[in-house]
Amino acid sequence: INFNVCCETSQGLSYARNRGIEEAKGDILVYVDDDATVNREYLSTIAQFFDRYPDAMAAGGAIYPVYETKEPKWMSKYTRELITAYKDEGRRVIRMTGSRFPSGGNAAYRREVFDRVGRFDPTLGRRGNLLISGEEKAIFYSMKKLDMPIYYLPSMILYHIIPQSKLTKQYFDNLTLSIGRS
């Protein structure tokens, strides 16, 4: 696998992702959050999946939090999903229908997706300390309007590193307010 590192001078997640689209030479584009690690077979799993599912236009996988400290007692299923992007849809490959989507921090797309639906909206997505979001959902919604299949791939595992600073009420309030603005 060939890797190319480039620098995007415009600050923001959507700008970086769009730069990746422009720079990439392959057919499959993979996006992983910068505060995460993946399982050893991550890229080979994705490559094999797209070979086996030629109809698939995008896929996302499981996301498990790795806390730098203990998970707080106040954490519920709902706060965990918001703060950590936790996702576990089971052990089978499934087509994500209706309002089900992968997380953008653990997603792979065929290049054709961006030729057909456009790029990530730079007015959305993380930018500096702003926690706005929704740029991936906009892409996924556009894909679903065109009936482009999106799958959940359980063996596409991402471990999301959660620092203590994200386990505070202040962070949670800022996050939910930002999501509401998005």
Feature annotation, model-predicted:
Residues Y78-R100:
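Short, flexible, basic/aromatic active-site loop/helix in glycosyltransferases
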Residues G104-Y109, V113-G118, T123-M156:
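A short, conserved alpha-helix in the catalytic core of glycosyltransferases
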Residues K145-M148, S155-M156, T168-S182:
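Catalytic core of nucleotide-sugar-dependent glycosyltransferases
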Residues L29:
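Short aromatic/hydrophobic "clamp" motif used to bind/position activated sugar donors
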Residues E41-M75:
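Conserved donor NDP-sugar-binding/catalytic core segment of glycosyltransferases
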Residues D33-T37:
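The conserved acidic donor/metal-binding loop of glycosyltransferases
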Residues I1-C7:
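Acidic donor-binding segment of Leloir-type glycosyltransferases
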Residues E8-A24:
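Glycine-rich, basic loop-to-helix element that forms the pyrophosphate-binding segment
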